[in-house]
Design a protein with these regions (language model features):
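Sec-dependent N-terminal signal peptides of Gram-positive bacterial secreted proteins and lipoproteins
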Residues: 3-23
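Soluble non-cytosolic domains of exported or imported proteins
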Residues: 63-67, 97, 105-114, 132-136, ...
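Amphipathic, coiled-coil-like alpha-helical scaffolding segments used for oligomerization/assembly
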Residues: 109-171, 248-249
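Second-shell loop/turn segments in exported
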Residues: 57-62, 100-109, 124-129, 177, ...
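Extracytoplasmic
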Residues: 44-47, 65-70, 79-87, 98, ...
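C-terminal solvent-exposed extensions
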Residues: 27-40, 44-47, 59-60, 64, ...
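Flexible, polar/acidic helix-loop-strand segments at domain edges
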Residues: 40-45, 143-230, 311
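Extracytoplasmic/secreted envelope proteins and their assembly/folding machinery
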Residues: 67-69, 100, 112-120, 135-139, ...
Length: 312
């Protein structure tokens, strides 16, 4: 009987132990964000458009999953600049409920506007307009502009040859590193590649963001001499291949006319996070990237705005 009582007492002591004694306590990351009133206004003549691609070939607005590609297109009419800024999907941020989590999860839980608001307060910008699409729609858009010419490495060529893409989806068929003309489907597979470094050496998700920016800039370069009529036809195809936008018809036409007037302008590229400002962080068992947001806000401000205003 005494032995049974002793065992029961020991069991009670074990059950009374805090969970932190049985498992490693999750470290709470320090993430710096801005209050809404601290976000500086967008300079006159500059517009931001968030291009958001869902991680699906058949996304539905009433059941959106994870966001995969997130690229900010900035059109600066005053200074004649066009900029693409990409965001890695696994960066650790504060969600709209102020709980930490990966950027890719926000749309599923808080909607597209929740993602826009999150990017704004983490990076000190005022995104107002967005386009939402999925991978099949991106494929159709690339086909609508006539495909895209891309230079790939031997490593990328080897990976793409093993992937389920038709040899006829590039011209010529991929054999080794070199320059190829990609169809829409092949371009999507290329942009999603993460197992081999990109042309510039960037690995993993950072390499994926580089490939996306490269496709966008390559398309822009191919359209520098496009006629107005052809450009309008491409715009019609683009608008037929989006899930959603918060832009009115007037907004779209205004943006189109501005971009058309600036055709031929070199597309500048930027990536968040910048080198040396992020590290691997395990959050509840999943890999994420913990960033120095103050350093990234300053870098974005310096690149995009110069001395127009100060980002705290």
């Amino acid at each position: 009987m005494r032995r049974l009582i002793a065992l029961l007492c020991l069991l009670c002591l074990v059950l009374a132990l805090p969970l932190s004694g049985l498992a490693q306590k999750q470290e709470i990351p320090d993430i710096s964000v801005l209050d809404e009133e601290m976000i500086p206004p967008t300079p006159l003549g500059m517009k931001h458009y968030l291009l958001l691609c869902m991680d699906s070939w058949g996304a539905k607005m009433n059941n959106l999953g994870f966001s995969d590609g997130m690229v900010l297109v900035t059109v600066d009419e005053v200074n004649q600049r066009m900029i693409t800024t990409s965001f890695i999907r696994d960066m650790l941020v504060l969600h709209p409920d102020n709980k930490p989590g990966r950027l890719t999860y926000i749309v599923r839980e808080f909607g597209v506007q929740g993602l826009v608001d999150t990017i704004n307060r983490h990076f000190g910008i005022e995104i107002e307009k967005y386009f939402v699409m999925d991978w099949s729609q991106v494929s159709s858009i690339v086909d609508a502009v006539g495909g895209v010419d891309l230079t790939i490495t031997d490593g990328e060529a080897s990976y793409l040859k093993r992937y389920a893409i038709s040899p006829s989806s590039t011209k010529p068929a991929i054999n080794s590193g070199g320059r190829y003309h990609f169809s829409g489907h092949a371009a999507v597979i290329y942009m999603r590649t993460r197992r081999v470094p990109a042309l510039n050496g960037d690995p993993h998700d950072i390499g994926r963001t580089y490939r996306t920016r490269l496709v966008l800039s390559s398309i822009a370069e191919s359209l520098k001499d496009v006629s107005y009529e052809k450009a309008r036809a491409i715009l019609d195809s683009v608008m037929k291949n989006i899930l959603a936008t918060n832009m009115t018809t007037s907004d779209v036409l205004e943006a189109f006319n501005t971009v058309y007037a600036m055709r031929g302008t070199p597309v500048e590229q930027f990536r968040l996070p910048i080198d040396g400002t992020h590290k691997l962080f395990i959050y509840y068992g999943g890999d994420s990237q913990l960033m120095d947001f103050e350093a990234n806000r300053k870098a974005l401000k310096d690149f995009m705005f110069g001395n127009t205003f100060v980002v705290h």
